[in-house]
Regions:
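Charged, low-complexity terminal tails
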Residues: 1-113
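Metal-dependent catalytic core segments for phosphate chemistry
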Residues: 70, 239-269, 273-277, 282-320
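Charged, low-complexity intrinsically disordered tails
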Residues: 132-241, 246-268, 275, 389-484
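A short alpha->loop->secondary-structure connector
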Residues: 75-77, 107, 112-120, 142, ...
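Phosphate-interacting basic helix/loop segments used at nucleotide- and nucleic-acid interfaces
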Residues: 29, 33-52, 82-104, 145-154, ...
Length: 484
């Protein structure tokens, strides 16, 4: 499998595209006017404790207060007190060091934790933890033992917090890992110095910019190229790589081609498709994605694909294709939270298991943690996917001003009948002789064409003259009834 990363940099935003076998798999966008908060550390102030929710609202200097749940308190502190009551840990006015682990979303504030974690290329340092762990993606038993021994040795010698070896640490020499952990300790010391003098509600530390985080978090062995179209960003990445990851330097390229870097693999076209509700499958079937406040639903349909004579085999093949497409779309659209998938009903238990196993296999490529909880009695696949940043739709779109975010508009006929009722109401109340109706082009056209006979009858019934004026700036649901 060939893999590469494209980085597109402009003053307003940075975009990173992960390409696998020539196909866009993941897209991350960071805008200068709205940089993500995940990883940022603040000195917050408790403004409200909610015992009923076992949570607290923390003021960290943002427009909306952030949310801290009991389960997100430092594990060391929880073990020490052993209480399940938030009031035993926090009180109003208390100053507390917190880190954002989930960006604000919609009307919800940021989610916080007091279990601070600082990532590097190979490890994650947790200053308030005693634990040592190894990424689950490292499967070799001997390598897991080696890494754990290395981390525990360093922890014991330096009497510091806990560490987790990241996937990139696999097969890396102990000396390199030790140097990486030394760097993390020095970084934490500089953060502690800032904490000591910081005022409440003050920002303490922020994570690296997206372009540099790409090297730290997205690069792995097998990625052939990292192409960046900004000379300044290219030099910054090379400088970072020379210090922290020398093996990456040869794969970083400054892209100077005539066409935009995202046009190499038609990223812009794929981006437009990722915002669509319907996703076509190669077989002729399609997926339908619907996002709500509480969950995302995915419906699988055969569409025009009828296959051969065996209907069950046709459904099975469509579901297999859908399993791969859904896993890709969840990653590309960055959909998180509760996700319900309605695969096409299959009679055979073996086919059901094969589709579920294929889906789980495709999900393994995703960096975000996901969990398939169960298949419901109705045959729906229920799963969760960890959400730390906004979905693609939330970043790039806003609710439709015409429909108010419903996704549908009243038909022109419905609006016409609504106008008739409004006219009757106004005439009976104010006894007018003339009325002017302002409406959209579509509605005005229908009133003067298909509804012309009804209009004539209404004028005779009410003994009133009704005039119309088409307003090009009105959406289909907009109209005004003006008394003359």
């Amino acid at each position: 499998m060939s893999e590469e990363i494209l980085i597109n940099v402009t003053p307003p935003e940075t975009r990173v595209a992960v390409i696998e076998n020539g196909v866009l798999q993941e897209l991350i966008i960071e805008r200068s006017c709205k940089i993500g908060l995940v990883g940022n550390i603040y000195k917050g102030q408790v403004c409200r404790v909610l015992p009923g929710m076992q949570a607290a609202f923390i003021d960290i200097g943002l427009p909306r207060t952030a949310f801290l749940h009991l389960s997100d308190l430092c594990s060391k502190e929880l073990e020490k007190k052993g209480s399940a009551n938030i009031e035993h840990y926090l009180h109003e006015g208390q100053h507390i060091i917190v880190q954002v682990f989930k960006d604000p979303l919609g009307t919800k504030g940021a989610r916080l934790t007091t279990d601070i974690s600082i990532p590097s290329r190979f490890q994650v340092y947790m200053p308030y933890s005693n634990n040592v762990g190894v990424s689950q993606r490292i499967e070799c038993g001997e390598e897991r033992v080696r890494l754990k021994n290395c981390l525990e040795k360093f922890k014991k010698e330096n009497e510091c917090g806990g560490f987790i070896a990241r996937t990139a640490a696999e097969c890396v020499e102990d000396a390199v890992l030790m140097a990486d952990m030394e760097f993390l300790l020095k970084l934490w010391e500089s953060i502690r110095t800032k904490i000591a003098t910081a005022a409440p509600k003050q920002f303490i530390h922020k994570d690296l910019p997206l372009s540099v985080r790409t090297l730290r978090d997205l690069y792995r062995e097998g990625i052939e190229r990292i192409r960046v179209d900004s000379k300044e960003t290219y030099h910054r990445l090379v400088e970072f790589a020379e210090i922290f990851a020398p093996e990456i330097v040869p794969v970083i390229e400054h892209y100077t081609g005539e066409c935009p870097v995202f046009d190499i693999y038609s990223v812009e076209d794929e981006l437009e498709k990722a915002l669509a509700r319907k996703v076509k499958l190669k077989s002729g079937g399609h997926l339908v994605f619907d996002q709500t406040e509480s969950m995302t639903t995915v419906d699988v349909n055969t569409g025009g694909y009828v296959g051969g004579r065996n209907l069950e085999e046709t459904i099975f093949k469509t579901n297999l294709e859908a399993a791969q497409a859904i896993a890709r779309q969840l990653r590309l659209r960055n959909l998180g939270g509760i996700i319900i998938i309605d695969f096409i009903d299959m009679k055979g238990e073996e086919h059901k298991q094969q589709v579920l196993q294929a889906f789980e296999r495709h999900l393994e490529k995703d960096r975000a943690k996901s969990k398939i909880t169960e298949v419901s009695i109705l045959g729906l696949v229920e799963m969760t996917r960890k959400r730390t940043r906004e979905s693609l739709e939330h970043i790039l779109c806003e609710p439709c001003s015409a429909c108010g975010g419903r996704g549908v508009l009243k038909t022109a006929e419905s609006v016409c009948l609504e106008i008739f009722r409004e006219i009757i109401r106004e005439v009976r109340q104010y006894k007018v002789q003339q009325i002017l109706v302002l409406a959209s082009n579509e509605v005005a056209e229908m009133l003067l064409d298909e509804k012309a006979d009804m209009l004539t009858e209404l004028e005779a019934f009410l003994n009133v003259q009704i005039k119309f004026r088409s307003e090009s700036g009105y959406n289909q649901e907009q109209y005004d009834v003006v008394l003359l």
